[in-house]
């Protein structure tokens, strides 16, 4: 029957399980019209019915899918018998959609997530399917897939599909007219936030925001990670070598801390993120300097006034010069055990710092403390012992009593090599000299302490006349002092000019 020929007209293919057959050319005097049906090797005969539309045959029960061969036998009242040519009909009452695949699934295969705005679908159906169409709007509009050489049906969406979750409807129609519908949920995700990485404030040990740290295992906070991130990596580059480390979110936070100590130097960190859709994004690089130590190279007492390097000065405002690495930004000094500090000033040459004590420092021995702090917050402390000695006693020189041969204390002697006693010489004196002036000529003689006493005796006889002696003293701190001049007269002879009897 025409309505039951559900495929291509005349192909004798039907999706009806009880198809109706029209029997034609049956004479009016037919006494018996029988239909023989062969299916699966078994033949069953049924009586046709004659109604208003003529002779017809409809199975009394559903036929299963398969091929059926029908032949009609007509017997008229006179006993004549006639047979029709056999008719083979195929019953096909259903079709299936075997699979729907999102071809450009861009991340984990089978998660139906893509970062392509024009998704590509592959539909696998039985070979007798001749139409496959797809819709994203509940069947309001359809797109027809194309069969490939492999037999699968392909469809690439011709227009951009918006981000979000979508329901794909696929309808397959076979040549028997059967239809199958199946749906596939998929997600389009084409965007991924740009991550950021920052050095933890607690580890930014120098000036805030300078990304210099004295921590060997500094911590980094990572932000801008989307909830659908499937992989978060940190790439660390140091001395030309890069290392990639996978991160895991802990307690809702993304954080990175090296698993071993970093040596001093520069490190560049970049965060790379991939989401479930396969989108990728990376942060701007962050360069961090690890600086875990600093040193004080030298401390010099600039106005060391005695022997160079003995750290002794006669200046009550000692001047110190401190040499440190160029990244040091604070140098401070103390001579009271760190109770009070004075800040040094950096000179025009980086790494050289100077400090002049602003108030008088009394005589005595001191311990200078110097503290240097670099840009990373590292501290180095060093001490220097120094002495301030700004005083020197005034020496005295006297003619030995034994040689004061005239009136005691008149400093007139008849000794050609008179002796002189020198007092007021401090224990730290490093030079004691006697300057002798006679007839406009000066001679300076250095003395040595003997037996705990300072004494001077001319090395050769002095001729008669007047002599002026001055003692000059210098101590280790460079202080200089001299005695008041002592005038001595040498008179080794006398004469009787005449004798008169009065």
Please tell me what each predicted stretch does.
Residues 1, 76, 85-103, 180-200, ...:
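Flexible, low-complexity linkers/stalks enriched in Thr/Pro that connect modular domains
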Residues 59-67, 157-165, 258-266, 357-365, ...:
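Surface-exposed, short loops/turns at beta-strand junctions within beta-sandwich domains
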Residues 1-14, 98-114, 196-213, 295-313, ...:
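Short, solvent-exposed loop/edge segments of extracellular or virion-exposed proteins
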Residues 17-21, 117-121, 216-220, 316-320, ...:
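Structural beta-strand segments of beta-rich domains
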Residues 53-57, 151-155, 252-256, 351-355, ...:
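Short strand-edge motifs at loop-to-beta-strand transitions and within beta-strands
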